[in-house]
């Protein structure tokens, strides 16, 4: 018969508690952070594609938003249905417009991992793209369910830059809306 020492139980419990706390920090949710700004994207200035909200636990400006130590989250609420092919096409088109082929090659593997997690959306669905500046994980969620989490500060900078970069963002009116007064 084996006896379990109380000290062993305390150490085991402390270890489990520490792991659970680290996990919750690694996947910190935008719901815990204040909304910094919001905007919308329209196709041909008439058809609303989505509303987007930017969340962060720290002060965000246009100058620091893509710093790799700044945690942030984009919540994208879709007003239309979109296929995975349309997501891939839009992502690749904007990234090619913003970055050199050499840079895109340097993030190719994590980008492919992220894109392989894409799911089609229906009107009313929500994608969250969150980045934790402490552990450098970018996380993609659909309707609050994790699709993928990747450790890559460079991927996060490029991917979130689709909306947040000064350099040819997906929509200049959206960018201006997100960063007015910032």
Language model: regions and residue ranges:
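Terminal leader/tail segments of proteins
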Residues: 27-182
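Hydrophobic core
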Residues: 17-21
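N-terminal signal peptide c-region/cleavage motif recognized by signal peptidases
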Residues: 23-25
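Bacterial N-terminal signal peptides that target proteins for export
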Residues: 2-14
């Amino acid at each position: 018969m084996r006896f379990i020492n109380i000290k062993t139980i305390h150490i085991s419990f402390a270890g489990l508690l520490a792991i659970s706390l680290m996990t919750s920090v690694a996947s910190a949710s935008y719901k815990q952070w204040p909304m910094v700004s919001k905007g919308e994207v329209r196709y041909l200035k008439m058809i609303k594609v989505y509303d987007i909200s930017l969340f962060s636990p720290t002060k965000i400006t246009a100058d620091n938003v893509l710093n790799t130590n700044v945690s942030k989250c984009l919540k994208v609420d879709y007003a239309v249905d979109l296929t995975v092919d349309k997501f891939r096409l839009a992502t690749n088109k904007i990234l090619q417009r913003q970055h050199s082929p050499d840079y895109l090659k340097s993030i190719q593997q994590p980008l492919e991992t992220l894109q392989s997690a894409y799911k089609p959306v229906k009107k009313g669905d929500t994608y969250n793209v969150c980045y934790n500046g402490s552990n450098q994980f970018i996380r993609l969620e659909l309707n609050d369910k994790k699709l993928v989490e990747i450790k890559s500060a460079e991927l996060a900078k490029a991917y979130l830059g689709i909306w947040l970069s000064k350099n040819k963002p997906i929509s200049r009116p959206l960018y201006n809306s997100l960063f007015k007064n910032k």
